[in-house]
């Protein structure tokens, strides 16, 4: 079933959605390669990639952001194909053994996984700052208040016992916020300022 651009299956597994969007993105990337074969300005490639390819790979990612290595690599493969092409057009030496994160940095891009994490955290920030109004989601945010001083300084209490629950949006983003110790930034910074802060934390 497809609802608002996201493919759902009865077991709430988003592998089908990821396969669909990667397939369509690779097709669009192939189209871009054909129509830009005489272009030389890397900025033009970035504009087309961001507008026609990457947006497909990030639409509603808060819902389907994968945790499995296979799905993460499947998505990153699209950007790797783009980087290989833009390296060739920019006369930058490309070889298969080059570090992917290093190549992303060379062209001022972040990995798709990093961008999905940023999108998750930005949505949580909007939720806590009441930019997004959702009583149900705000009710899922539980603060951890220990009865005595502990070494564990995590702010959010994450309720999840099964893997499917852990992979859903709220447990996933609260766990990430705990890991990065972002509570003060989440509740005290407005979205634009918070986005600048959190973007610097990811490759």
Residue spans of the language-model regions?
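Hydrophobic/basic alpha-helical segments
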Residues: 1-203
């Amino acid at each position: 079933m497809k609802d608002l651009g996201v493919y759902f299956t009865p077991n709430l597994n988003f592998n089908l959605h990821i396969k669909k969007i990667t397939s369509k993105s690779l097709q669009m990337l192939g189209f871009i390669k054909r129509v830009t074969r005489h272009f030389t300005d890397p900025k033009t490639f970035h504009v087309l990639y961001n507008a026609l390819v990457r947006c497909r790979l990030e639409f509603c990612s808060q819902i389907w952001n994968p945790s499995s290595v296979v799905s993460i690599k499947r998505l990153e493969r699209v950007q790797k194909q783009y980087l290989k092409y833009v390296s060739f057009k920019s006369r930058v030496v490309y070889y298969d053994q080059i570090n992917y994160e290093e190549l992303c940095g060379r062209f001022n891009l972040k990995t798709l996984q990093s961008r999905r994490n940023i999108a998750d955290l930005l949505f949580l920030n909007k939720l806590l700052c009441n930019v997004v109004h959702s009583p149900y989601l705000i009710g899922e945010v539980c603060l951890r208040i220990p009865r005595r001083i502990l070494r564990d300084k995590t702010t959010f209490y994450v309720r999840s016992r099964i893997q499917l629950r852990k992979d859903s949006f709220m447990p996933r983003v609260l766990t990430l916020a705990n890991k990065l110790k972002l509570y003060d930034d989440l509740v005290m910074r407005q979205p634009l300022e918070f986005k600048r802060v959190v973007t610097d934390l990811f490759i």
